[in-house]
Swiss-Prot record:
The lineage of its organism: Bacteria, Bacillati, Bacillota, Bacilli, Bacillales. This is Regulatory protein DegR. Homotetramer. It comes from the Bacteria. It comes from Bacillus subtilis (strain 168). Induction: Expression is sigma D-dependent. Negatively regulated by ComK.
């Protein structure tokens, strides 16, 4: 597997992760409305971490 293939696979994985995070956040918000702000913060942190990984991949 070359670098291009790896990046493509990781990119597709990140898209799936974003989708899963959004779905998880929606489920959590419906289950415990009092935790909505906390869940949104977790969701945002996860997205920021994934974005940081994507940026590092582009730099290298």
């Amino acid at each position: 597997m070359d670098d291009k293939d790896l990046k493509l696979i990781l990119h597709k994985t990140f898209i799936e992760i974003y989708s899963d995070l959004e779905e998880l956040a929606d489920i959590a918000k419906k289950g415990k409305p009092s935790m909505e702000k906390y869940v949104e913060e977790i969701e945002q942190r996860c997205k920021q971490n994934i974005l940081a990984i994507e940026i590092q991949m582009k730099i290298k």
